[in-house]
Amino acid sequence: MNTKGKVYEDKAVSFFLNRDYRIIARNFSYRHGEIDIIALKNKILHLIEVKGGKETFGDPAFRVNSRKLKKIMKVGNYFIATHPKLEFDEIQIDVISVTNDGVINYYPAQRL
């Protein structure tokens, strides 16, 4: 990960910690891809994609496409399989964007 990417992710982690999320993992990788942040709140497991950068062509979050979401689901399934003691009732894929100006937009997705 590049330095800017780490800065965006650190800001996203702070955002979630300030809202009482428990960060379970960061940059969890599997052969299908990576999940930037895995967090837990109110028995919901959040698989979070962080996007950062300029808003030249709209919010950076809009760069998340269906292919990326499928990768997150595959990696999420692997994470769950390798963490059987983790207790949760639902799974949700979320996207958070951090612009170069520090603006944070959080897009909680539908629960799976």
From Swiss-Prot:
Domain of life: Bacteria
GO molecular function terms noted in the UniProt entry: nucleic acid binding
Pfam families: UPF0102 (PF02021)
Family: Belongs to the UPF0102 family.
Name of this protein: UPF0102 protein Pmob_0702
Source species: Petrotoga mobilis (strain DSM 10674 / SJ95)
